[in-house]
Amino acid sequence: MTRSLGKGPFVANHLLKEIEILNFGGSEEVVVTWSRASTIVPVMIGHTIAIHNGREHLPIYITDRMVGHKLGEFAPTRTFRGHARNDKKSRR
């Protein structure tokens, strides 16, 4: 089920305040956040946001094509190590 249009997108207040301060000051800093559920809004374009993946913060540069997506979509939480090999040695 999608979010109601009357509510608008969810963006964590602390994240939005930090982006507004950076836009007003004009500085280029990496914004660190744990809020993977926040929606990317046009105000964030051009900033680098470090998104937590459960172990570390991954720096992600926000572009205009990312608007409307969630921050967590760009920081994968699982590492794929490959499928099991299909030979005689690995079966033992």
Curated annotation (Swiss-Prot):
Keyword annotations of the record: Plastid, Ribonucleoprotein, Ribosomal protein, RNA-binding, rRNA-binding
InterPro entries: Ribosomal_uS19, Ribosomal_uS19_bac-type, Ribosomal_uS19_CS, Ribosomal_uS19_SF
One example of a Gene Ontology biological process annotation: translation
Highest taxon above the source species: Eukaryota
Pfam families found in the cross-reference section: Ribosomal_S19
Compartments it resides in: Plastid
Molecular functions per Gene Ontology: rRNA binding; structural constituent of ribosome
Gene Ontology terms: cellular component: mitochondrial small ribosomal subunit; plastid
Gene3D superfamilies listed in its UniProt record: 30s Ribosomal Protein S19, Chain A
UniProt feature coiled coil, ranges: none
Protein family membership: Belongs to the universal ribosomal protein uS19 family.
PANTHER family, per the entry: RIBOSOMAL PROTEIN S19P FAMILY MEMBER, SMALL RIBOSOMAL SUBUNIT PROTEIN US19M
Its job: Protein S19 forms a complex with S13 that binds strongly to the 16S ribosomal RNA.
Protein name: Small ribosomal subunit protein uS19c
Organism, scientific name: Aneura mirabilis (Parasitic liverwort)
